[in-house]
């Protein structure tokens, strides 16, 4: 190898070292910085995913409490669990990305800058030393030749000249070998760094492949079952159908497990442990027995049964179903026996019930329209005595006691209030009380409770309305005769102001006769509260 060739290789070696220090290491630092940003973004995704699947679990809990969607709740739980496992695998990938790539690269790049500087300096020093030794031998040979040319006996310098020539040849070979080895070492150092980067990136890719493979395996196994569960949104589970049949066969008595849907969010302690029915006052027992036996088409919360489709935004497609198995009717039958609080509302079909028409128009609870004090609390007066027994959550009172209500609406026929006499608080049967008007006078109040309190007699916010008769279309001979002080019939129609004159003489009318026997309702789709057509 000529001297010019050796010098060229020496420059290439120096360029390799400088490329590593001036280009590779800065680029690697930038790569690490971008990797940290990527890691931070993945950590944010992990945090958001936890909140997302917590919300999915809550939706599953809601569905599992429903008689018609319990299996969909299980599906939502499975979805949350599968995605939790996938998310755990993603977290493992994130840990691998941090520990096996970013951390090690960051350590290497800090040590590498000092190592390369020392390696380049050592190479340059050694190369310079060998080059200086070669130059010195060449200078000595040149001097020796000048002496031999001016000497009378040049032969005596020939042996020494040969020695210098051999020394120069050896030193030049050493220099060339060293430069060649230095260039090879520089290329090796460069390749080792790129190989280290590729190796660590392969480890991350391996974990990423495991993450995607596990996700694919879990989803491929569960996805067909999930799709099958939601294939028919109009199908009612057999469990709910059997429950409705049991309710129909047992006159509305259902198992306590069906009553747990609306109990999970009570802030105050549950007033009905074990879903026990309320005690029946002896004065109202015949009346309740008659009404419970005649309920065929109940209305839940003032909304009609199968024909009420005013709010159904989730129904993408509607298949023809028997109305006896429709979800609204199953809900109404469930609410029909949801509470045995007395008196019980008698719901009839829209053809012979004006109250049902009112409920369709005004589904809100208006039992709070009267009895408010100046401070906004409603007061009621006990018309029957109630004993709490050993239950500390119930309120005991005697007939004639005044109670201040502490919650806005009754729950399953129970209300929460404070006795003004004993200053004790607790739950009590709302039907055992009578709402007080603002002037302090009391009136009979009937809690028409299905899921929540709803009073048909007060739907038009009239404070002077009395208790409605149990059935507008049935004969009055089946209704037991009551005294005016115990149970009064509602005269004429409470829904139309034009018939309010009937309130003046209703005391003179016989309470054993049903004044609505010949009343036919005028069908309407408006909210103008039209008067019934009397024939």
UniProtKB/Swiss-Prot annotation:
PROSITE patterns: IMD, SH3. Residues 1-250 form the IMD domain. The modification Phosphothreonine is found at residues 341, 361. The modification Phosphoserine is found at residues 262, 324, 326, 337, 347, 367, 385, 396, 455. It is found in: Cytoplasm; Membrane; Cell projection, Filopodium; Cell projection, Ruffle. SUPFAM superfamilies: BAR/IMD domain-like (SSF103657), SH3-domain (SSF50044). Adapter protein that links membrane-bound small G-proteins to cytoplasmic effector proteins. Necessary for CDC42-mediated reorganization of the actin cytoskeleton and for RAC1-mediated membrane ruffling. Involved in the regulation of the actin cytoskeleton by WASF family members and the Arp2/3 complex. Plays a role in neurite growth. Acts syngeristically with ENAH to promote filipodia formation. Plays a role in the reorganization of the actin cytoskeleton in response to bacterial infection. Participates in actin bundling when associated with EPS8, promoting filopodial protrusions. This is BAR/IMD domain-containing adapter protein 2. It comes from Mus musculus (Mouse).
